[in-house]
Amino acid sequence: MPKRKVAALEKVEADLVNLQYKIRRDPKSYAQEFYDQWLAYDAQRQIFFSSPATASSEDIKKFHDLVDLVAHVADLYPDITAPFPDHLKQLLTQHHTTLDKDLREKVVGSLVLLRRKDVIDSVSLLTTLFPILISSPSKSLRTLIYTKIISDLRESNAKATNHKLNRTIQTVLHNLLTSDRTSSKGLWACRITRELWRRQIWTDARPCDVMKEACLSDNEKVVVGGCRFFLGGDKEREELEDEESDEDIDLKKVKHQSLINKKTKKRQKAYEKALEKIKKQERKKHAPHPLNFSALHLINDPQGFAEKLFQKHLQNLKNKFTLENRLLVLQLVTRLVGLHKLTVLPLYSWFVRYLTPKQLNVTTFLACLAQATHNLVPPDVIEPLVVKIANEFVSEASAAEVAAAGLNAIREVAMRQPLCMSETLLQDLVLYQKSKDKGVMMAAKGLQSLYREVYPEMLQKKFRGKEATMGLRAGEIKPLKFGEEEAAEDIEGIELLEKYKEEQKKKKVEQGEGDGENKDGGEEDEDDGWNSSEWEVASDTSESSGGWIDVSSESEDEGPAKKRQRKDSGAEEVPELVDTSKTNGEVQTNGEAKAGSEARPNGTAESTAEAEARRISKLATTTILTPADLAKLKELRQQAKLDKMLGNTAKRKKELIEKHIEDGLTAEDIELPAQLGKKATKEEKLERARENKPSRDEHKSTQALRKAKKEAEGKSSTNKEKARKKNFFMTLGKAKQKQKRSLVETRKALRAHIKRSKAGGRRRNGQ
């Protein structure tokens, strides 16, 4: 075979690569050779600065290789290559539109390489690349620069947050949006901010201020980008975390493969690398998680922002946004109003013209109206809208889907402001539970169930239900007035702990009566957590600090055990109420109070309320809660929540909505009751059946699927499976030999089998 002739350019390229390798190994010895190449680079640079568009392909190739060489060894000769970064910046800034594509990408890559070698800092790199990102007409160059900017910011914030760099870039993005509000260049600011927020590199309020300016821009695309950031940025974060968790390495599988496969250095390194990655993931999981607030919570001055957004993009008649984009802005405004409980009264009158069944995307308008409602919105402002929905949507002439959507929208509004409608309108709407359509019936029943919980007085007696009627009579249900907030008066769940302690006392008393006299003379020590075996040291100062401890006299201790026990058990049942306003001779006991309760009904209710308040706060004011008490209190709270969730569907639904109020409402939530009466088509049933099931190209048996799963995990078949699939003629010899064995040989084989099984098989896995 004849020897191939090597072209001159290939020789130069090979020489430069070889020179780079030698310089990396011994910089001092090859300083002169590098200086010669530096002079060649400088000459080519001057040619490119004079006329970059007219350069030949050979010159471009040569300059490309020289830039690559200098960039890789610039950190070894800092004195010679000091002007090199400025040369690249100047070349890229002035001639990025006329440079060759490959050379342009090499210059960008060389700047990034210099940043990684700490020849230049991140601020210098990003301030060079960002103007080119905005102004370059080349899509490939913009994509490359965007990728480099994101990766550099990620690396700069990898070990610790680089606040100085972040502030600089955020200021650049903010100025880009505010300098020209009509330009579409601000779209890059939205993309960069959204990506860094999604990756949790920027988590403070400054990126939210940048996106606020994007929402107030005059360019439609920039406004849409800003609105989508606030409406969907947190969901993107969660999806990214789920994707990262799916990529976790299976340690069990890696260990299994390392035991089965042949031991090589490559596999050992791969195993160690996977092990290190798993340890890093574990450290990340157990590390203290920083507070991760939603972007909507970090907005400065949400009231002013919501008002500006509404006036500029919704109330302004000159605005030419499409309906879809206006709905995005509306969703953001209503989310802000509902989340921060803002007062934007013109917003509610703006809704009136859109609340008709013929309006396009009317369910989205209904969902936004419900989002914008909260308990501090005046009922006089909301009531006309509810009446409009009832008149337009809920009538005998309306279609079932329309009526169901209207009733559900009214229910969502009433859930946030129960005073939004009159009793007459509520009675008319509740009567729709007799409708033949299932969706309308369920929507009306949902409205009735809601008012049974929050405002049963507005319902007729026959619609209130048993629990609401009993709660009204007992005074347990107290509807809140407009502007009134339900404040906590005691420790959450303290009554559960008090009830638990009373039950424990009663159990001890019953056990004491069954066993006869107590060995300790009838004295019962209350196990309040300090006397438990779990706590070795108890504090005596807490007992002597207050004046709440009952000390029994000697005469009581000397008395019979049964009398004291009867006395104690009687004292534990119900404490007598004493009217302290009377003199000692006119003390009124609980029994006398009960006798006179019929003559004074109002006084009885007041005294009962006072007694209830004293009873609830008794444990918190007279007892120091121990760690055991607090642990039990937490357990009782969880059990009470579980009972409530399993018991009452309406309460559960209300609590879920209050819990996820930040998620906002969608058109699907409003349309949900209308779907109840519909029969699913065959295609919908098949699609529902295929959900959460692996896609199968062909039908396979369970064993085949199990085998495929096993092979995917890198596991081989068992010895039992191998023996079963073995050729019959290959097993004949062993079978014949088994039959000819003597008893001694059989005994040896059995003993060897037992010994191997105890040792963990032939591989001795048990040792």
Swiss-Prot record:
- Report the source organism: Chaetomium thermophilum (strain DSM 1495 / CBS 144.50 / IMI 039719) (Thermochaetoides thermophila)
Keyword Protein transport recorded:
yes
Q: What is its main location?
A: nucleus
Any one cellular-component term (Gene Ontology): nucleolus
Q: Where is this region: Disordered?
A: 504-614, 662-767
Top-rank lineage group of the source organism: Eukaryota
The annotated regions of Basic residues compositional bias extend over 749-767
User: What is an annotated GO biological process for this record, any one?
Assistant: protein transport
Cellular location(s): Nucleus, Nucleolus
Q: Give a yes or no for keyword Protein transport in this entry.
A: yes
Q: Where is the composition biased (Polar residues)?
A: 580-591
Alphabetized UniProt keyword annotations:
Coiled coil, Nucleus, Protein transport, Ribosome biogenesis, Transport
Family named by the database record: Belongs to the SDA1 family.
* Protein name listed in UniProt: Protein SDA1
Enumerate composition-biased segments (Basic and acidic residues). 504-521, 680-701, 710-721
Its biological purpose: Required for 60S pre-ribosomal subunits export to the cytoplasm. May also be required for 60S ribosomal subunit maturation and accumulation.
Quaternary structure, per UniProt, is: Associated with the 60S pre-ribosomal particles.
